[in-house]
Amino acid sequence: KPGSGAPQVVTKRCVADFAATDPLPQTIVPYMGIVQDRLAVEVLRGCARGCRFCQAGMTYRPVRERPRAQVVEAAERGLAITGYDEVSLTSLSTTDHSGCAAILHQLNADLAGSGVRVSIPSQRLDSFGVEMAAEVGGARRGGLTFAPEAGSQRLRDVINKNVSEEDIELAARNAFEAGWRRVKLYFMMGLPTETDEDVVGIASVAQRVLDIGREVVGRGYKSGVSVSISVAVFVPKTHTPFQWSAQLGRDEVIRRQRLLLASTHDRDIKVSYHDADVSLVEAVLSKMGRAGFDLVMAAWRHGCRFDAWTDQFDFQRWLDAGREVGVSLEGVASAPMSLDQRLPWDHTSPAVSKGFLKREWRRAAAGVTTADCTMESCTGCGVCPTLAVSNRIEGVRDGK
């Protein structure tokens, strides 16, 4: 309210010196098995890759790396006080840490023979070299996860993924030659400008990765080579260049999912995808802002509880709630927004300027990529001058 003393725009706070914080402020070990049943050590915060669909990549800027010695010490201290048999080096893009390979090498050496596994949530395709492949495989093995996100180079340029076909094939070869047998690939469906050709391209990328695995390891079920692809439905997220986008209609999402399944012919490629109805509700909640309060309350009255759990989600309840408050769920999700309109979340700011997001939206439409400012020049997102901070890189990043 005017005169209340509250700022018209609330800007995020930022930890400028990430290395001054304790990676393990409090580690609680549960009495039961949980989904993420492992020690987690955050090795860096922020990401400047600039994927245009990614909210975290925009809102957690700038990039701040922890020193290598601090990461190793925290991991070993955490394992000693918790008894976990796995430690995950977490961040938005762990392999982007300038000392990632050295950290893995040190942990693998120190933990040799202990039965402890060192894991990384996801690997960047263009920073997963031979050395990285060997170090990730140095401890107890699981599967490797990469995120090409789109099935064609054209669409990867639109979303600013900045990985090439060569990057994908080289990362796959490095992984298989280092002894890995299972690779998981993450994609998104319904991205702005996506066509059927891009959808079919998802299956083609998976097949190429599988073929490389068979070339390196051999064919047949005994080789153990397999590829799984997980396909999320694009949800427009606030404070991203794609916040003005429409979500693909529910029926069209289902049609494209079926097209992908029909395009995947190899039994060693497993396909899973997100529920179209869940993704529709996510888009509605993302785009409505404060106006979504009445919808959420109506959904609660209709019995919605723990809807992030698959066995609890009931789309009909959300449809009933929408009718009660006069909201068409698909109408909200599939409606594009104007670059000039005031958005429901404009009273909050991650310190990335709206002007930068608009420029990125226009560059996406033109298929023009934007470089990572930790490896090239400043892209003018506005975070550093607004918060009086800067990227803090411990070593040298070269993107490979």
PLM region spans:
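Conserved, mostly hydrophobic/aromatic
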Residues: 47, 51, 71, 120, ...
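Flexible glycine/acidic-rich beta-alpha junction loops that bind and position SAM and/or redox cofactors
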Residues: 49, 97-99, 128-132, 154-159, ...
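Conserved SAM/AdoMet-binding glycine-rich loop
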Residues: 77-228, 232
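Terminal amphipathic helices with adjacent charged low-complexity linkers/tails
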Residues: 1-13, 66-67, 74, 94, ...
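N-terminal [4Fe-4S]-dependent radical SAM core
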Residues: 1-40, 351-363, 393-398
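Cysteine-cluster motifs in flexible loop/terminal segments that predominantly coordinate metals
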Residues: 54, 337-400
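N-terminal pre-triad scaffold of radical SAM enzymes
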Residues: 27-53, 79, 120-121, 142, ...
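Canonical Radical SAM [4Fe-4S] cluster-binding loop centered on the CxxxCxxC motif
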Residues: 33-69, 379-396
